[in-house]
């Protein structure tokens, strides 16, 4: 199931994302973050982290560097910068 989700994200990156202007406010991009979260934390936790990141990526967000956390937590990390 994890591999299928990664394949869907890669499909989005290759065929859909190039058709749209870049809008992600974060580094790494939300789709790359989602893949890294799945690889590092597995299907359930990685999906939770990826969806939480996508919800944070909006015009009201400052964005910036936001890597996948080493340790999983349901609580969002505090960013003081």
UniProtKB/Swiss-Prot annotation:
SMART domains: Haemolytic (SM01234)
Membrane topology: Peripheral membrane protein
GO CC annotation terms, alphabetical: plasma membrane
InterPro entries referenced in this protein's UniProt entry, alphabetically: Membr_insert_effic_factor_YidD (IPR002696)
Subcellular location: Cell inner membrane
Keywords: Cell inner membrane, Cell membrane, Membrane
Pfam families: YidD
Protein family per UniProt: Belongs to the UPF0161 family.
PANTHER family for the chain: MEMBRANE PROTEIN INSERTION EFFICIENCY FACTOR-RELATED
Function statement: Could be involved in insertion of integral membrane proteins into the membrane.
Protein name stated in the entry: Putative membrane protein insertion efficiency factor
Species annotation: Thermotoga maritima (strain ATCC 43589 / DSM 3109 / JCM 10099 / NBRC 100826 / MSB8)
């Amino acid at each position: 199931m994890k591999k299928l989700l990664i394949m869907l994200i890669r499909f989005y990156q290759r065929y859909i994302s190039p058709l749209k202007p870049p809008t992600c406010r974060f580094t790494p991009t939300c789709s790359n973050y989602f893949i890294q979260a799945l690889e590092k934390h597995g299907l359930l936790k990685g999906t939770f982290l990826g969806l939480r990141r996508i919800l944070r990526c909006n015009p009201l967000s400052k964005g910036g560097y936001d890597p996948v956390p080493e340790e999983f937590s349901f609580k969002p990390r505090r960013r003081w910068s």
